[in-house]
Amino acid sequence: MGAVPYNWILGACEKVKSVVSCPVATVGRVVSVEAGEKILEDGTADIIGYGRSLLTDPDIANKVENGECIRECLNCNKGCVDAIQSRRYLSCVLNAENGDEETIFIQPCTETKNVAIVGASLAGLGAARVAYKRGHTVTVFEKSNRLGGQINIDSVPPRKMKSYVLFNTMKNSYPIK
């Protein structure tokens, strides 16, 4: 998780906007559509640059238009910032298809099945998402009384609460029993 505050560059953006007459863009942990909309409505910036958010969910614009849930960036920096710094292939822990969109397609199945997923961690729910998108009926089994697996531990520090918020978005994104 990043230790830099959300929307951290807005102060500088406001200063630039006050002295120029051209459109001004902002970046810097603007990780949700709601945060971006507020910045635009307040007039702080004219354009929002979603970087890592688009690695997590490249279909944000269509999902906003259709009222669908969006996978939000955790700001964990694994696969994106870490990869850039070590000159590796870009990826995202929440988007297995990232970087392979033109070669990996979630195809509808020819025969629907009842699919059982054991464990409701991020990985389990990710598998459930793919099975559901293929057309299967999905049931997730979890032995504890809380869904999320290790995300429950990860989200304890205050700056990591985003993990739990994201997990709740994921578990409510698809009709999974």
Can you say where each PLM-predicted feature lies in the sequence?
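Flavin-dependent oxidoreductase catalytic cores
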Residues: M1-V118, L122-V138, R146
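Beta1-alpha1 glycine-rich phosphate/pyrophosphate-binding loop at the start
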Residues: I117-I176
